[in-house]
Design a protein with these regions (language model features):
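Non-heme di-metal
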Residues: 1-195
């Protein structure tokens, strides 16, 4: 059984150029994404307290994402980059959330699967940023570590879904959402942002 997500569309090189042209803005957005990821994991705990089998993993993920926020903030602070005054709307996340079914059971499945896809996209993009950071070895190492961590998170949300839904249903819906994510990523404009 496979828990990882193979993205259907690779990030284009123009995205990396956009990020490298404004690394401070990227890092501000990255910090916001880590805060949101931590909050998302904890929102699963709050919304689904009866799903006791996954609560420990969700708490662990929430804490890890908050540690990532702390780490990116330390790198920002060292470089004189402040946190953004407000968290901007993320058209990528909004586009994905629009794909969620509305009935509570299927929405739960969709949110888990979208979390996997988002984490896998983050891992792919952290790898690209890492590979582009030739002049800052410290930041390069940081993004290398994040790339491996985010890849792991992509797997755990699929595993969580498989605890509550039949394998066929999970993978069919994962493939649908993954294809839709690929189309979304190809049509969004490039920004100095993670998504």
């Amino acid at each position: 059984m496979k828990f990882s997500v193979d993205l259907t569309a690779a990030t284009r090189p123009e995205w990396v150029k956009t990020v490298m042209a404004d690394l401070p803005a990227f890092m501000q957005d990255h910090a916001d994404c880590e805060r949101k990821a931590s909050a998302m994991a904890m929102s699963f705990v709050a919304k689904y307290p009866d799903r006791v089998e996954i609560i420990p993993e969700l708490i662990e993920t929430g804490v890890e994402e908050l540690e990532h926020f702390q780490q990116v903030y330390a790198h920002m602070s060292k470089r004189g980059i402040h946190l953004a005054k407000e968290m901007k709307q993320d058209p990528y996340i909004q586009g994905l959330m629009d794909l969620c079914k509305t009935d509570p059971i299927n929405r739960f499945l969709d949110r888990l699967l979208l979390a996997s896809i988002i984490e896998c996209r983050g891992a792919e993009r952290f790898r690209l940023v890492c590979n582009a950071l030739d002049k800052d070895p410290e930041l390069k190492d940081f993004y290398h570590g994040l790339w491996t961590s985010e890849a792991k998170h992509g797997n755990i949300f699929v595993k969580m879904a498989l605890r509550y839904f039949p394998e066929k249903q999970v993978y069919e819906r994962l493939n649908e959402l993954n294809r839709a994510e690929g189309k979304l990523i190809e049509r969004l404009p490039f920004r100095a942002a993670l998504h």
